[in-house]
């Protein structure tokens, strides 16, 4: 993302209003570019990193990154694309997660050129009359144009009043920070457009919108998602990150080069030719090295590649692996997998056990009700590429 053309084209699905944004970028004015992230869990993943890297590209062009940590919006959860209401998340948890977010975010953004605002900064101070005033700025006609709400009604599935407030809250964030541009996934288009409406209602110039594609998850089919557990976390160690990239299907390699690196399009086409010529594994190693290097440096990427080769070419465990202490002498195998962050849900843990993908000290786990005795440290392996030393 070294220039304006790359910024506006790479991984971008739609721009509102493109001509206005191009003129603003050409004007030399310092733009306020907003990106919001909801800290419903502590992890950011490579899908989030794409827009963070877009935001960094704006910074490199001299613009101000305005980062919204949605500790209040996260308590509701974005209803877009969901056929039922999300479970409520405790505000204390979202606040704590937001602080962990920043450690990951500043692996990408320039801290000195970034404004950070939790949206509790304004929502926690609003009284009910102010909430009603905000609600009066958006018509029910607009709300009912949301495809998700229309589909729920058509399927006789309920949606609740608090869900209606999500797009209002995201939009009001833009008012409070006076955003010139907002970044977001295409699936958030309704929320982003609501921001423009609210800015107009509050007498502000409407923000331009840059809407991006989504990154495919590890299966190469569905969107990378925290809820699906198919993600590569920015908190993963170099070895974990490298191994997870190596698990994606060959069909997703070009997509990952486009969305997760700055490799030029011409080079990506050359990589795709090599894949067709049977060099898929080697190209994937180069991809995994490149991605790991972005977040862990060349030294970390090189060591992760060596660990990978040792594990799979020589059938050895990595020399170094992450450690996790549970504070108890016994823990269920499913609980250990979830608490350590190796999986996102009980259903994912059970599925992996059922498929024979979980081992303790090299022994396959066949019982999802197994209780692990941690009187001595053990090696927990999930899948072919994830190893963790666990202890009490």
Put a short name on every predicted segment:
Residues 18-79, 183-189, 195:
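N-terminal catalytic cores of NTP/NDP-binding nucleotidyl/phosphoryl-transfer enzymes
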Residues 79-95:
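A charged helix-plus-loop insertion that forms the helical arch/lid used to bind
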Residues 77-81, 126-132, 220-224:
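Short acidic, glycine/serine/threonine-rich loops at helix termini
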Residues 199-392:
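Conserved nucleotide- and phosphate/pyrophosphate-binding catalytic cores
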Residues 28-36, 65, 166-176, 217, ...:
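Short, hydrophobic/aliphatic alpha-helical segments
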Residues 12, 90-211, 218:
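Divalent-metal (Mg2+/Mn2+/Ca2+)-assisted nucleotide/phosphate chemistry catalytic cores
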Residues 82-87, 132-136, 227-228:
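Short, hinge-like loop/turn segments at secondary-structure boundaries
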Residues 1-27:
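N- or domain-start disorder-to-order transition segments that initiate the globular core
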């Amino acid at each position: 993302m070294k220039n304006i053309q790359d910024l506006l084209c790479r991984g971008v699905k739609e721009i509102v209003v493109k001509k206005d944004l191009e003129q603003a970028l050409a004007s030399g004015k310092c733009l306020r570019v907003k990106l919001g992230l909801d800290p419903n869990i502590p992890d950011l993943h490579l899908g989030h990193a794409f827009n963070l890297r877009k935001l960094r590209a704006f910074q490199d062009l001299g613009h101000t990154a305005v980062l919204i940590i949605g500790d209040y919006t996260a308590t509701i959860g974005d209803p877009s694309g969901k056929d039922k209401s999300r479970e409520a998340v405790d505000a204390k948890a979202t606040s704590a997660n937001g602080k962990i977010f920043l450690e990951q975010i500043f692996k990408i953004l320039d801290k000195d050129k970034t404004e950070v605002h939790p949206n509790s900064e304004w929502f926690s101070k609003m009284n009910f009359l102010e909430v009603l005033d905000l609600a009066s700025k958006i018509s029910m006609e607009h709300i009912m144009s949301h495809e998700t709400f229309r589909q729920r009604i058509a399927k006789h599935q309920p949606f609740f009043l608090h869900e209606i407030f999500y797009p209002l809250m995201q939009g009001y964030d833009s008012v409070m920070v006076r955003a010139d541009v907002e970044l977001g996934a295409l699936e958030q288009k309704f929320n982003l457009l609501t921001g423009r409406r609210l800015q107009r209602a509050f007498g502000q110039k409407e923000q331009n919108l840059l809407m991006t594609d989504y990154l495919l998850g590890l299966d190469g089919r569905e969107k990378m998602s925290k809820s699906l557990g198919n993600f590569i976390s920015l908190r993963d160690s170099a070895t974990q990150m490298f191994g997870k990239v190596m698990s994606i299907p060959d069909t997703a390699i070009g997509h990952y080069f486009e969305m997760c690196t700055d490799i030029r399009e011409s080079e990506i086409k050359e990589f795709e030719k090599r894949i067709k010529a049977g060099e898929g594994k080697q190209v994937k190693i180069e991809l995994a090295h490149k991605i790991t290097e972005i977040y862990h440096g060349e030294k970390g990427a090189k060591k992760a590649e060596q660990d990978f080769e040792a594990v799979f070419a020589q059938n050895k465990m990595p020399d170094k692996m992450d450690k996790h202490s549970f504070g108890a002498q016994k823990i269920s195998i499913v609980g250990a997998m979830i608490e350590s962050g190796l999986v996102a849900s009980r259903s994912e843990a059970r599925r992996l056990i059922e498929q024979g993908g979980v081992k303790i000290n090299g022994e396959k786990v066949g019982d999802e009700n197994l209780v692990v005795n941690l009187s001595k440290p053990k090696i927990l392996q999930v899948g072919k590429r994830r190893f963790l030393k666990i202890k009490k």
